[in-house]
Amino acid sequence: MFSAAISVFVLATLTAATPMARGIIPAPPAGQCNVGTQQCCNSVQDASSDPAAGLLALLGINVQDVTGQVGLTCNPITVIGGVNSNCDASPVCCENNSFGSLISLGCVPVSL
């Protein structure tokens, strides 16, 4: 009886003392975005690059206000097996796609 009580106590102590990672956010699974939507962009560039900066200026957007990369001529990636389910160019997750398919802001690469 005494050994069973000791075993329960030791097991509870070991369980409570097991180190756990705190504050670490796991990466999203391949093909998923933490924020924004998946896009297939013909080109992904830094906001300060000439083509991206030119389009941003035409839209009245300050280059310094853009975080992440800029996707040019992007289309949404839909469910697997759909018409737009694959991407032969640059698959990215973008935060701001409110400019049609011309430009997407805040893009990060994603694996499909």
Swiss-Prot record:
Q: Which InterPro entries match?
A: Hydrophobin
- The name under which this protein is listed is Class I hydrophobin 5
Which superkingdom is the protein from? Eukaryota
Per UniProt, what is one GO molecular function of this protein? Answer: structural constituent of cell wall
User: What keywords are assigned to this protein?
Assistant: Cell wall, Disulfide bond, Glycoprotein, Secreted, Signal
| Gene, per the UniProt record | Hyd-5
Assembly information from the UniProt record: Self-assembles to form functional amyloid fibrils called rodlets. Self-assembly into fibrillar rodlets occurs spontaneously at hydrophobic:hydrophilic interfaces and the rodlets further associate laterally to form amphipathic monolayers.
Q: Which CDD domains match?
A: hydrophobin_I (cd23507)
Report residues carrying sugar chains. N96
Q: What induces it?
A: A CT-rich motif, which is often found immediately upstream of the transcription start point of highly expressed filamentous fungal genes, is present at the expected position. Two additional CT-rich regions are also found upstream of the TATA box in the promoter region.
What is the disulfide pattern of this chain? C33-C93, C40-C87, C41-C74, C94-C107
Q: Please list which residues make up the signal peptide.
A: 1-17
The entry assigns this protein to a family as follows: Belongs to the fungal hydrophobin family.
A single Gene Ontology CC annotation of this entry is: extracellular region
Task: Enumerate the subcellular locations listed in this protein's record, separating them with semicolons.
Answer: Secreted; Secreted, Cell wall
